[in-house]
Amino acid sequence: ASEGSTGVIVLGSHMTPPRKVSSTGVIVKVIAVAIDNVDRAMVRNVLRDAPSTPFVPGRSFCGRVVDCGLDVKRLRPGDLVFGLQDLRKCGALAEYIMVHQDVVAVAPEGRLVPEQIAALPATGVMVHQIVQNHCMVLPRGSRILVLNAHDMIGRLTMQEASRLGMVTVAQVPPSVPHAEALCRQNGAVEVLMGDPLWTINLLHESSFNL
């Protein structure tokens, strides 16, 4: 536990795997879990509050379906899936997790390893919200600036913006190796090497729609 925390982080095996599944539930044997800043913040908060019951963190995961409820039609045992557990529940850092069918989907196989697949849900949901709320209201050909385009959120945003016909300008720090090639592979038309603040100061805000 960190300084100032009253709880303790442990790796244990005292929790039994789920045996019964609800009609709309899915039991997944977890292969990989992606931890982001949201998960870290939740763990810090839980430790500070000294929980009376164990808290299992982890939201974004990849695994294989073990069992499905009677009303689950699009998944079956053996499917490789990825998903994002509800923030109020978490629990992915376990051998098994039971989730509602709506928070999992069949994962892409062949091009990504489970660790990479596990990172997609948390990032993908955020990018989906960005695209739905901002990009999709713009006409094709609109210019958008993506800051820190080399990270996962930036890459997915460039891919989706390019698919919608946006003209994407990417900013990446000079320290990122092969940055220009990486951004162009993900849909960038122009790549600017520099810090985010430098890039914003360099460009006039009227040059972009977003």
Identify the meaning behind each predicted range.
Residues 16-35, 44-90:
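Glycine-rich beta-strand-centered segment in the early N-terminal region that forms part
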Residues 39-43, 152:
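Short, glycine/acidic-enriched capping/hinge loops at junctions between secondary-structure elements
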